[in-house]
Design a protein with these regions (language model features):
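C-terminal motif of bacterial Sec signal peptides marking the signal peptidase cleavage site
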Residues: 16-19
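Bacterial lipoprotein signal-peptidase II cleavage site
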Residues: 21-27
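Serine-esterase "nucleophile elbow" of acetyl-processing enzymes
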Residues: 28-126, 143-148
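Structural recognition of the beta-strand scaffold that forms the well-ordered cores
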Residues: 57-67, 123-128, 152-158, 190-195, ...
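Oxyanion-hole/transition-state-stabilizing segment in secreted/luminal serine hydrolases
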Residues: 67-74, 129, 133-173, 196-199
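Active-site segments of SGNH/GDSL-like serine hydrolases
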Residues: 155-161, 180-216
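Catalytic His-Asp segment of secreted/periplasmic serine-dependent ester chemistry enzymes
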Residues: 198-281
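Glycine-rich, flexible loop motifs
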Residues: 281-361, 365-377
Length: 377
C-alpha cells in the first residue's frame, strides 16, 4: 500500500536546516506565510477583543512549544540569541539569562503576534522558555512582570515538562493553579492552552505522568477555576486529520512540531476543527526513539534490545535519525515500520525528516534480510 502524506498548499513549506550553525537558514518569504494564516476567531472573549482592537499588550508564557523550538529546523542557544539581539526575558537568581527566540521562529506564537500587531497591539512579549515547567514558572512568576505589571491578554501553555518536574497530578494542579491565579490577576483576558501530545518520549527520561494525564489535569484545573482554555491536545490531532496530515509528519523528533506542525497548531488554535475526519490514534503507534545506538538499517525486525524487548514492536512504530541509516539514506530519515504477528515486516522511509512529504521509499523483510529500498509507488 502506498504511504503518502498530503502537503498543505501553504507558503510556510520551506527548506529547513538539518544542523544548527551560526547563520540562520533562509526560508520562503515569512511575511507571506504569516499573512495567509487564519485569524483567531474562536468563541472566546480574547478573540473578540483582538478583532475590535481592544488588546494593546500580550504576554505568552510557555515552554519549548511556545518558544518555537525547531520551527526553523534549529534550536537556538541563549548565547546565540543574545548575540542576535533578541529580547531578554528574565535573569534567574543564579545568573542564568533567558532570551526570546527570533520573532519569525516562534512557532504558533508568530501567527498570534502578526494578528495582534495588525490589530494595533503595541506590546507583545513571548516569555516561553524551553525546558521549563509550570512548577518552575510558579517559582519565578514575579520575574515575568518586571517590564510591566499587567497585560491586556495573557496566553499560557505549560505542562509537558511537568511530566518529570511534578510527582503527581495533585502537585501539578497545585503548582499550575497558583501560577495561573497570579497571572489571572494581572490581565483582562487569560487563555490557557492545553499542551499538545508528546508522541515521542525519550526512553532515558522517567516520566511521572503522560501527556494525556497532563491534559486532563489542565482541563480539570481550568474547569474548576473558570479559565478560558483551548484544548490543543484534542484539537491539534483533529486539525491534522481534517487537513489530511498524519500526525507523525508534523513533529520534529516526536516532541516538537516542525514548521508545518506549528502552522497546523496555530490553525487549531485559531478556530475549532470541523471534525471531518477521524483523528489519528497516535497512542496506537509506538515511538521507538531517535538516533539509537542499537538500531541500524540492518537490524532484523525481531531483534531484541538489552532488556529483551523487541526493537521493532508489533504494529506500527516510528523512528527518527539524522545519522546514516543505510547507503540510500545517508542523512537519516523518518521511518514507519509495520510488523505483523506472522513475521512479515514492511518499512517506509521519508528522507525529509522536517516537512510533510511522501514516504518515497519502501522495503520488506524477506528470506532473512531486508530488500533494497524501492520507490514507493
Amino acid at each position: 500500500m502506498r504511504r503518502v502524506i498530503s502537503v498543505l498548499s501553504l507558503a510556510v513549506l520551506c527548506l529547513l536546516c538539518t544542523a544548527c550553525g551560526w547563520t540562520k537558514p533562509v526560508p520562503l518569504p515569512e511575511e507571506d506565510a504569516i499573512s495567509e494564516a487564519p485569524a483567531l476567531t474562536r468563541d472566546l472573549p480574547v478573540a473578540e477583543a483582538l478583532q475590535r482592537g481592544a488588546v494593546q499588550s500580550i504576554l505568552v508564557i510557555g515552554d519549548s512549544i511556545s518558544d518555537g523550538n525547531t520551527d526553523d529546523g534549529c534550536v537556538w542557544g541563549q548565547d546565540e540569541r543574545e548575540a542576535l539581539g533578541c529580547r531578554l526575558i528574565l535573569t534567574e537568581e543564579n545568573g542564568n539569562r533567558y532570551y526570546e527566540n527570533a520573532p519569525d521562529s516562534q512557532g504558533w506564537v508568530k501567527f498570534l503576534r502578526a494578528q495582534a500587531e495588525a490589530a494595533g497591539a503595541s506590546v507583545f512579549h513571548n516569555d516561553a522558555i524551553s525546558g521549563m515547567s509550570a512548577k518552575w514558572f510558579n517559582a519565578h512568576k514575579e520575574l515575568l512582570f518586571t517590564e510591566q505589571d499587567r497585560y491586556d491578554a495573557i496566553f499560557v501553555m505549560l505542562g509537558t515538562n511537568d511530566r518529570t518536574a511534578c510527582q503527581t497530578g495533585e502537585e501539578f494542579r497545585a503548582e499550575y493553579g497558583e501560577l495561573l491565579a497570579y497571572v489571572a490577576a494581572r490581565c483582562e483576558y487569560l487563555t490557557v492552552l492545553v499542551p499538545i501530545p508528546a508522541i515521542y518520549t525519550p526512553t532515558d527520561t522517567v516520566k511521572n505522568m503522560n501527556s494525556a494525564e497532563i491534559a486532563e489535569n489542565v482541563r480539570t484545573l481550568c474547569g474548576e477555576a473558570g479559565y478560558d482554555f483551548i484544548d490543543c491536545y484534542k484539537d491539534f490531532p483533529q486539525m491534522a486529520a481534517d487537513l489530511g496530515l498524519p500526525l507523525g509528519s508534523l513533529y520534529w523528533g516526536g516532541t516538537h512540531p516542525n514548521a508545518v506542525g506549528y502552522r497546523t497548531l496555530w490553525t487549531a488554535i485559531a478556530h475549532e476543527p470541523e471534525g471531518t475526519a477521524q483523528p489519528e490514534d497516535f497512542a496506537s503507534v509506538t515511538c521507538i526513539g531517535c538516533n539509537r545506538d542499537d538500531l541500524s538499517g540492518e537490524t532484523a525486525p525481531d531483534a531484541m534490545d538489552a532488556s529483551g524487548d523487541p526493537l521493532y514492536p508489533l504494529g506500527v512504530s516510528w523512528y527518527y535519525t539524522w545519522n546514516t541509516f543505510t547507503p540510500a539514506l545517508p542523512y537519516g530519515a523518518f521511518l514507519e515500520t509495520h510488523r505483523e504477528t506472522d513475521g512479515s515486516t514492511v518499512q517506509y522511509a521519508r528522507s525529509n525528516k522536517y516537512q510533510p512529504s511522501e514516504f518515497s521509499l519502501v522495503r520488506r523483510w524477506e528470506n532473512g534480510g531486508w530488500t533494497d529500498w524501492a520507490d514507493n509507488d
